[in-house]
């Protein structure tokens, strides 16, 4: 995973440096998300790694699946470049890194909130408000549930992790009692 990130980062940065305004960033987000989704498909990933499938066939497959209108000439150029360098398998990682760069530039932090039960809109707003105040940036919440947490929530924003789950509290209590 770390190796893929290292290989994908220069491509994501290069694409990001092409974008000068929000409209262009949004266009590239759509392009990269579409390409990343197609490239992440198990069947497509198997073809990308198959030496019997030519570079031209892979390019054609991606262009057909995503649509040349969606990609535009710059998107086609990226696909060609990645194919030439044997890096089409990096598309999902490139898309993720691009979104991270975009969020940073726009002063937004993506936050993963995992809770034991579904959060209400009011709870989501309360968490977002508290995190915005603490981090000093706009917050974009991504919520999911995991009943294994028993209660509470686990919040992850970049390197920051706040474990307010019952499972986490029990683990810390158990660890403290063992020492």
Curated annotation (Swiss-Prot):
InterPro entries: ATP_synth_OSCP/delta_N_sf (IPR026015), ATPase_OSCP/d_CS (IPR020781), ATPase_OSCP/dsu (IPR000711). Keywords: ATP synthesis, Cell inner membrane, Cell membrane, CF(1), Hydrogen ion transport, Ion transport, Membrane, Transport. The keyword Transcription does not apply. It comes from the Bacteria. GO terms for molecular function: proton-transporting ATP synthase activity, rotational mechanism. Its main location: membrane. It is a peripheral membrane protein. GO terms for cellular component: plasma membrane; proton-transporting ATP synthase complex. The keyword ATP-binding does not apply. Transmembrane segments: none annotated. It holds the Pfam family OSCP. It is found in: Cell inner membrane. PANTHER family: ATP SYNTHASE DELTA CHAIN. F(1)F(0) ATP synthase produces ATP from ADP in the presence of a proton or sodium gradient. F-type ATPases consist of two structural domains, F(1) containing the extramembraneous catalytic core and F(0) containing the membrane proton channel, linked together by a central stalk and a peripheral stalk. During catalysis, ATP synthesis in the catalytic domain of F(1) is coupled via a rotary mechanism of the central stalk subunits to proton translocation. Belongs to the ATPase delta chain family. F-type ATPases have 2 components, F(1) - the catalytic core - and F(0) - the membrane proton channel. F(1) has five subunits: alpha(3), beta(3), gamma(1), delta(1), epsilon(1). F(0) has three main subunits: a(1), b(2) and c(10-14). The alpha and beta chains form an alternating ring which encloses part of the gamma chain. F(1) is attached to F(0) by a central stalk formed by the gamma and epsilon chains, while a peripheral stalk is formed by the delta and b chains. This is ATP synthase subunit delta.
């Amino acid at each position: 995973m770390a190796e893929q990130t290292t290989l994908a980062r220069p491509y994501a940065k290069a694409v990001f440096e092409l974008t000068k305004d929000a409209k262009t960033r949004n266009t590239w987000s759509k392009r990269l998300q579409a390409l990343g989704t197609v490239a992440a498909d198990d069947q497509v990933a198997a073809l990308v790694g198959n030496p019997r499938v030519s570079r031209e066939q892979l390019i054609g497959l991606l262009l057909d699946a995503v649509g040349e209108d969606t990609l535009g000439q710059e998107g086609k150029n990226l696909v060609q470049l990645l194919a030439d360098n044997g890096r089409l398998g990096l598309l999902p990682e490139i898309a993720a890194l691009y979104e991270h760069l975009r969020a940073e530039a726009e002063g937004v932090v993506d936050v993963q909130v995992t809770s034991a039960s579904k959060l209400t809109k009011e709870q989501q707003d309360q968490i977002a408000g508290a995190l915005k105040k603490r981090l000093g940036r706009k917050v974009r919440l991504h919520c999911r549930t995991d009943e294994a947490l028993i209660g509470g929530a686990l919040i992850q924003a970049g390197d920051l992790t706040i474990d307010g789950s019952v499972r986490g509290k029990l683990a810390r209590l158990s660890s403290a009692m063992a020492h």
